[in-house]
């Protein structure tokens, strides 16, 4: 079973100010490389105006992979995490609910 995570992040302003396009691309690539190095598969990256943050949905092989990714991205000093939430597969969860109800 994989581990699906929703995260909201904000750029650390000082890390992104006055960058050339090449420097910006290098920092962005570093983030995606960390995700990939831990088996992460980016499903979506959007901007959430109501949270004033980037919202990402990433699938990982397990929770440890997700946690290690967050730690390494924080170490870059380019993003801060506002919120991290585990997402449950609705079909899988519904099956668990039905199974629990059948045991009654």
Model-predicted regions and their roles:
Residues 1-36, 41-52, 65, 90-104:
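Short S/T/G/P-rich N-terminal loop/turn motif that feeds into the first structured element of a domain
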Residues 5-7, 56, 84:
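A structural signal for short, well-ordered beta-strand segments
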Residues 53-59:
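Short cationic amphipathic helices and targeting signals
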Residues 59-91:
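An amphipathic, aromatic/His-enriched active-site/gating alpha helix that lines ligand/cofactor pockets
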């Amino acid at each position: 079973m994989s581990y699906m995570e929703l995260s909201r992040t904000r750029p650390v302003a000082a890390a992104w100010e006055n960058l050339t396009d090449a420097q910006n691309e290098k920092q962005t690539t570093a983030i995606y490389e960390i995700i990939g190095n831990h088996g992460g598969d980016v499903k979506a990256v959007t901007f959430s105006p109501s949270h004033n943050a980037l919202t990402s949905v990433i699938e990982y092989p397990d929770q440890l992979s997700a946690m290690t990714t967050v730690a390494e991205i924080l170490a870059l000093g380019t993003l801060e995490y506002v919120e991290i939430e585990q997402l449950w597969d609705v079909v899988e969860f519904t099956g668990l609910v039905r199974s629990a109800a059948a045991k009654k």
